Regions:
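Residues embedded in well-ordered regular secondary structure
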Residues: 1-35, 72-75, 115-119, 136-138
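Surface-exposed loop/interface segments of Gram-negative outer-membrane beta-barrel transport/assembly proteins
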Residues: 1, 32-34, 43-130, 146-148, ...
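Short glycine-rich loop/turn motifs
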Residues: 201, 270-276, 284-286
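Membrane-spanning beta-strand positions in outer-membrane beta-barrel proteins
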Residues: 9, 20-24, 56-60, 134, ...
Length: 335
């Protein structure tokens, strides 16, 4: 089987000097080398921009959807183990559950073609929705302020189902676990996982940038940022599906034996303030200073805040007259 794919892209835009809009659409469908395996991706986004005097408003909304299916014919390694004398059908043309071993002391190999004819499920889904809104304010030619607010939500799910007729429950590797009267009632397995996370972030930046007396360049900026995120997830395994044509969680007989449900829940809050100062003299020498204070709920109750600072000096040697005449050298900087 040869895996092929297709991909489509589209972009539309329009508007006026004050108001602009654009939208992007992408779709990609890829088939795997194994029959039945595929990856489908869709991404879309829309951007809105509006200018009013010294204010610029922007909003970007995007959505991403991914769906993947694994082949019900098994993995490539299942076929690597096959021998030329293995036949998937018996003399009556019926699919074998297990391929005949070479000798009596060997166990039969599970027939992937037999399992492919069953109603198995092995898929994953992922969805992400994001919205970012920002405002730029040109207070003065050398003084600007920018505010941004963002929110994103992601949901991922996984489904894995083996019907009662699957060779998994009759394999010698199970040591007869599903061959007892109670074991027969437990045949059929469904694993389901779900994780959802939501993130909010906001930040405000005030920036000053001006040149004095044609030689002195000064930049100073302050940024305030806030982030909060929450994540919830769980995984369950159920067994005992009498009807293979109705692989629904509600049709399970019980929770899977020896497989406990699991879950996780986490919440994080973060706050930070950053200050930066940069001074440059005649495009030759410069000084950088920065300081940041971080507050994070992950730090613990005793030390909720931490601070960082840095400083740096630099010399743009390529701006010196004795270097400008060297054509082979266009940049040389010492820090």
């Amino acid at each position: 089987h040869l895996g092929v794919g297709q991909r489509y892209n589209a972009r539309f835009e329009g508007g006026s000097n004050e108001f602009r809009w654009s939208t992007d659409l992408q779709y990609k469908d890829t088939e795997g080398a194994m029959k039945g395996s595929s990856r489908k991706n869709f991404n879309g986004g829309i951007t809105l921009l509006y200018k009013f005097k010294t204010l610029t408003f922007r909003n970007y909304t995007s959505i991403g959807i991914n769906h993947s299916d694994e082949s019900n014919y098994g993995s490539f390694s299942d076929y690597v183990r096959m021998q030329p004398y293995n036949t998937p059908y018996d003399k009556n043309g019926v699919l074998r559950m297990f391929l005949e071993p070479f000798s009596a002391i060997e166990d039969g190999i599970e027939n992937p073609l037999y399992n492919a004819a069953l109603n198995t499920i092995n898929s994953k889904d992922y969805k992400m929705l994001t919205n970012n809104f920002s405002v730029d304010w040109n207070i003065l030619p050398y003084l600007t302020m920018r505010g941004q607010l963002g929110v994103s939500n992601t949901v991922s799910t996984s489904d894995y189902f083996l019907p009662a007729e699957h060779t998994y429950f009759s394999s010698p590797n199970r040591n007869g676990e599903y061959d007892t009267p109670e074991g027969y009632m437990r045949r059929g397995l469904y694993r389901y996982g779900n994780t959802e996370s939501t993130t909010f972030n906001a930040d405000v930046t005030l920036a000053f940038n001006k040149i004095f007396a044609e030689r002195h360049s000064l930049y100073a900026g302050v940024n305030w940022s806030l982030l909060t995120s929450k994540s919830d997830g769980f995984n369950i395994a159920l067994e005992g599906f009498a009807n293979s044509d109705a692989p629904k969680i509600a049709n399970a007989r019980q929770h899977a034996t020896n497989i406990m449900p699991s879950g996780n829940n986490s919440t994080r809050h973060q706050f930070g303030v950053t200050g930066n100062v940069n001074y440059t003299y005649n495009s030759r020498y410069y000084l950088d200073l920065s300081y940041r204070v971080d507050g994070n709920s992950m730090y613990g109750s005793k030390e909720k805040y931490s601070s960082f600072w840095s400083t740096g000096l630099g010399w743009n040697v390529h701006q010196e007259d004795f270097i400008k005449n060297i054509k082979e050298l266009n940049m040389l900087r010492l820090k």
